[in-house]
Regions:
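Anion-binding alpha/beta catalytic cores of soluble intermediary-metabolism enzymes, centered on
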Residues: 9-75, 113-116
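Cationic, amphipathic, low-complexity alpha-helical segments enriched
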Residues: 8, 141-142
Length: 142
């Protein structure tokens, strides 16, 4: 509640001995510039104005700048972390300039994950495993 501090970021993930939820709940939602506080996350889920986590925000900006139409498309998000996977899946499904997409969330335990990826119009890999998605897994575009 220090008026001299405008905002701050809790660098996630935290070490295992630190209770991440306890830390996130201690954040003043008005100063949570990463959008991880449950209040801000809830606002994002309701498509209300709030801070958006940095990486999902960057993905949305890339889609805008490259004029990639997402409306009515099938998006597969690989990863379900509250840092990238869940927020981007919410944003891609929300109404807006970038969004209005049908979203499937896959993860490391999804059986036959390749079959989901091959059906997708847009694939967002947030699994944290470099090179996980291979060229032959992507749907061919005519």
């Amino acid at each position: 509640n220090n008026d001299q501090i405008d905002g701050f970021i809790v660098q996630l993930p935290l070490p295992k001995h630190i209770n991440e939820n306890k830390i996130l709940l201690a954040i003043n939602p008005d100063k949570d510039v990463d959008g991880f506080h449950p209040t801000n996350f809830g606002k994002m889920a309701l498509n209300m104005k709030t801070f958006i986590p940095a990486t999902p925000y960057g993905i949305i900006e890339l889609l805008k700048r490259y004029k990639i139409n997402t409306q009515g498309k099938h998006t597969v998000v690989i990863g379900r972390s509250h840092i990238v996977g869940r927020p981007i899946s919410i944003l891609m499904n929300s109404k807006g300039e970038v969004g209005d997409s049908t979203v499937t969330v896959a993860h490391s335990r999804t059986k036959n994950i390749e079959s989901y990826i091959k059906k997708a119009d847009i694939v967002i890999s947030a699994l944290g495993i470099p090179g996980f998605v291979k060229k032959n897994m992507i749907k061919k575009v005519l």
